[in-house]
Amino acid sequence: LGLSYGMYAVFHLSELTFLNSFLGGIAILSCAFLIDFIVKKNKFQDQHSYSLLMFCVLCNVNQMIFKSPIEILGLLFILLALRRLLSLKSQIDVSKKLFDAGFWVFWAVLCNPTHWLLLLLILVAAVFYAGHHFKYFLLGFLGFACGLILHLATALVFEDTAPNYLNLLPNFDFKIDLRHDLPQLINLYVLIVLGIVLVIFMSSIYIPLKLNQQRNLSLLLILLILYTIYSLFSANFRPINFMFISLGLAFLTGNILQIKGLKLIYKELFLWLMIGLGIFQF
């Protein structure tokens, strides 16, 4: 992943400054570390972090993520929030984890308003793991509000005017527009094919897992669905949205690669096809 980012920076020297390239590289490698940590901590895959492999491949297919360090930072905040939500399966410090998730979501929203959707995911996680306590439904919003107050206070110290947070609200027009340039069309087709593959193997992914693992995988599936619906109906769609969809797909399709009944040749063909598409994007 670091090599791919370095190659992108070399090919796009006119678009990225050295500082942006350095910060983006640190952030993207931090994202990779968190994905590997989440997969191993929740035991989604037995021996290997296939989800991390899929994330690296999808980053190469959708290289828009390399273009903006801010978007990479937003992805990092998403993963920090997901780490707290998926750790709810232990039933330890539930209130603290929901609060922390809401706090990280606020900083993700500052990077891209699309990440408002994660507040809905926090509500779903509260239903899964603390549905009998109504107060837990508010903790994600309290964490979000805490992040907002901290940001507002910092902004007022260093600036004369308060930020306009209304600009961060999502905007919908409910018109599906699939007209994209060739690189984005390739991203779209890849995501569609991966979605179809995921539907085919969904039962094979879920059955071997324990109940709490199934719940966590359901959270990732809901994350994928939320970003997909938003991308279809958003009034200010940007190609980077494909990467947010890819995050959920990376976790879920990574589990397909560990299905024991699937022949090795099919797995290798699948991976080489994805790698080839990534090379083509350069």
Residue ranges and their predicted role:
Residues 81-96:
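Membrane-interface transmembrane helices that cradle and orient dolichyl/undecaprenyl
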Residues 39-58:
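Transmembrane-helix signature of polytopic, membrane-embedded enzymes
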Residues 25-42:
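Transmembrane-helix motifs of polytopic, lipid-linked glycan transferases
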Residues 3-13, 165-186, 198-202:
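Juxtamembrane membrane-water interface segments that cap and precede transmembrane helices
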Residues 97-111, 228:
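Membrane-interface alpha helices of multi-pass inner-membrane proteins
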Residues 17, 54-72:
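Aromatic- and kink-enriched transmembrane "portal" helix at the membrane-lumen/periplasm boundary
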Residues 118-142:
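Perimembrane helix-loop-helix junctions
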Residues 203-261:
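Membrane-water interface signatures at transmembrane helix termini and the short loops
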